[in-house]
Amino acid sequence: MKPAVDEMFPEGAGPYVDLDEAGGSSGLLMDLAADEKAVHADFFNDFEDLFDDEDIQ
């Protein structure tokens, strides 16, 4: 027996919307672009050259 949606998410759907309700995928992308973006405070951009193949043997 599969749980019903209200059993899986008793707090409701939250910020998620159906693509049909968002006006299609373009409306959803505009909603995502309008949201505030944040980066984790402990994330350090400590990547060296990701495309450096000189060290591959």
From Swiss-Prot:
Keywords: Cytoplasm, Nucleus, Signalosome. It comes from the Eukaryota. GO terms for biological process: cellular response to UV; positive regulation of cell population proliferation. Signal peptide: none annotated. It is found in: Nucleus; Cytoplasm; Nucleus, Nucleoplasm. Pfam families: MYEOV2. Component of the CSN complex, probably composed of cops1, cops2, cops3, cops4, cops5, cops6, cops7, cops8 and cops9. Component of the COP9 signalosome complex (CSN), a complex involved in various cellular and developmental processes. The CSN complex is an essential regulator of the ubiquitin (Ubl) conjugation pathway by mediating the deneddylation of the cullin subunits of SCF-type E3 ligase complexes, leading to decrease the Ubl ligase activity. May play a role in cell proliferation. This is COP9 signalosome complex subunit 9. The gene is cops9.
